[in-house]
């Protein structure tokens, strides 16, 4: 019979061993991969031909994994679509898919590759992780048969999922995530019936995973942080940059800061589709990032992160709500930012305090420029409404931005360079949400690590003069509970815009091949 003192001793010993094996910091790696694409992605090929292409991409990923492991990385994230590319049909993607089991089966494909059928891609990823003693995050395709007993079963008798997989340092499959929020043009894949919440624990923290477009929605992204207390998000993506507020490095670093977690973003590298921008982001500042529209090369990033980052919560409306309500003046004007109509005020002096409102949101800006240039216009904008283009999601945004030209109606158009330097800025707003993501983007699409901070009362302010001219300073708020609060007319407009955007994206794809 085991006595209770002995049980207590064993429990204490186990706790001590567990604590001794845990790491306060770890080295993260992300790889922006320039994928080798199929010549004719809409044409079905044999599994052998598909595997040849995937192995060519895996050869490149192997080089990145090996290099990262030699530099001490504990985990590496690779991009969405990185193994086979994109723009497939439902039929043409099929030869690239494998059956990916639930990780609870406790499977190491490297040592038992035939347990779940023919799985050469999973075997290779597993062996790569095992041989290099590193966690590997990859994006591949899953297939699951179904039949008429399932009323949702697709016409071809199978579900096809855009899938993230994670193999641990022994090559064991420890996580599988089926992408929930499919983007326009992803008709080759099905969305799972319910959002999947996928986490796994390591000696260097708890990890959660989701893919690309999902960052704009509550589930699973926010749920992973709020309800499952993950320390680090793993984020394979094929992200098309959209200025002024949705470039990859800008928004992903802002999400890390707003949600107060580490964020490892690996983007595909394909400048013809405006796809670039990867990074390793901590809650207080970016640790490493890469944005390159000029070359065709991939890029490996590494940086050290805290295993359990802890940042204080922010009251995003505290400061701005204490300010007097401004009178609506005749200097306001309207201009469109990514199909949304903002209310703007032009910044007319070298320094000043401005407030602009739209609906329930008032945005307050204090700033000082080094000089007021005659050839550039900056404006303070507010938007409080439902965005209905590539998806429906409710936004509250306060933004200081450079206008494309001297014409005020160009405020919100895409612009990549600026010349105006700021000495300081402080931006706040009366947000109706706790989910606000602070962005600072400098000329030539560069971040400003260590140059700004968010206060506990909701101000985004500069710590020193920014190191480059400012493109935008933005507080990007999400009101998830109002995403479906659209009327019939808004739905009709959204449907038309989605069709138009889908046609544009299809044309972009076809021109790329």
UniProtKB/Swiss-Prot annotation:
Coiled coil feature spans: none
One annotated Gene Ontology cellular component of this protein: side of membrane
Membrane-crossing residue ranges in chain numbering: none
InterPro entries, alphabetized: Biotinidase-like_euk (IPR012101), Biotinidase/VNN (IPR040154), C-N_Hydrolase (IPR003010), C-N_Hydrolase_sf (IPR036526), Vanin_C (IPR043957)
Main localization (coarse): membrane
Active site per the UniProt annotation: 80, 179, 212
Reactions mediated catalytically: (R)-pantetheine + H2O = cysteamine + (R)-pantothenate
Propeptide: 488-513
Signal peptide stretch: 1-22
Tissues showing expression: Detected in kidney (at protein level).
Gene Ontology biological process terms in this record: pantothenate metabolic process
Gene Ontology molecular function: pantetheine hydrolase activity
Lipid attachment site numbers (GPI-anchor amidated glycine): 487
Subunit structure: Monomer.
Similarity annotation: Belongs to the carbon-nitrogen hydrolase superfamily. BTD/VNN family.
Protein's name according to its UniProt entry: Pantetheinase
Organism encoding this protein: Sus scrofa (Pig)
């Amino acid at each position: 019979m085991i006595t209770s003192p002995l049980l207590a001793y064993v429990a204490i010993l186990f706790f001590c061993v567990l604590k001794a094996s845990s790491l306060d910091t770890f080295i993260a790696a992300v790889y922006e991969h320039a994928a080798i694409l199929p010549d004719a992605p809409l044409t079905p090929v044999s599994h052998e031909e598909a595997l040849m292409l995937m192995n060519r991409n895996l050869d490149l990923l192997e080089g990145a994994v090996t290099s990262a492991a030699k530099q001490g990385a504990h985990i590496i994230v690779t991009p969405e679509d990185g193994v086979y590319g994109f723009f497939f049909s439902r039929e043409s993607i099929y030869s690239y898919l494998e059956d990916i089991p639930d990780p609870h089966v406790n499977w190491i494909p490297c040592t038992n590759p035939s347990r779940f059928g023919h799985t050469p891609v999973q075997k290779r990823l597993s062996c790569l992780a095992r041989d290099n003693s590193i966690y590997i995050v990859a994006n591949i395709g899953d297939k699951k048969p179904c039949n008429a007993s399932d009323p949702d079963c697709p016409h071809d008798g199978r579900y096809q999922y855009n899938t993230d997989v994670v193999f641990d340092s022994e090559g064991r499959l420890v996580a599988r995530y089926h992408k929930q929020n499919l983007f326009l043009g992803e008709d080759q894949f099905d969305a799972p019936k319910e959002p999947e919440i996928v986490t796994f624990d390591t000696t260097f923290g708890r990890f959660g995973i989701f893919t690309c477009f999902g960052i704009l929605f509550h589930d699973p992204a926010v749920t992973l942080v709020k309800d499952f207390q993950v320390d680090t998000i793993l984020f394979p993506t094929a992200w098309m940059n959209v200025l002024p507020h949705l470039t990859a490095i800008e928004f992903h670093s802002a999400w890390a800061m707003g949600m107060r977690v580490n964020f490892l973003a690996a983007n595909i590298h394909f400048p013809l589709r405006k796809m670039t921008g990867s990074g390793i982001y901590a809650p207080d500042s970016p640790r490493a990032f890469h944005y390159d529209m000029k070359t065709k090369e991939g890029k490996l990033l590494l940086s050290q992160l805290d295993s359990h980052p802890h940042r204080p919560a922010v009251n995003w409306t505290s400061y701005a709500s204490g300010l007097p309500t401004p009178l609506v003046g005749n200097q306001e004007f309207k201009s469109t930012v990514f199909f949304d109509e903002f209310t703007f005020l032009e910044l007319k002096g070298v320094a000043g305090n401005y407030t602009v409102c739209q609906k329930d949101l008032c945005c307050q800006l204090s700033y000082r420029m080094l000089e007021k240039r005659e050839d550039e216009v900056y404006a303070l904008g507010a938007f409080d409404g439902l965005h209905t283009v590539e998806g429906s999601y409710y936004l509250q945004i306060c933004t200081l931005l450079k206008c494309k030209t001297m014409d005020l109606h160009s405020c919100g158009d895409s612009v990549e360079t600026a010349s105006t330097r700021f000495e300081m800025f402080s931006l706040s707003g009366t947000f109706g949400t706790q989910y606000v993501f602070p962005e600072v983007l400098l000329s030539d699409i560069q971040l400003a690590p260590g140059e700004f901070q968010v206060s506990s009362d909701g101000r985004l302010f500069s710590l020193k003069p920014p190191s480059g001219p400012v493109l935008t300073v933005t507080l990007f708020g999400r009101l998830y509970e109002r995403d479906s609060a659209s009327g019939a007319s808004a739905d009709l407009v959204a449907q038309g815009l989605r069709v138009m955007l889908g046609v544009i994206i299809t044309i972009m794809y076809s021109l790329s091949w």
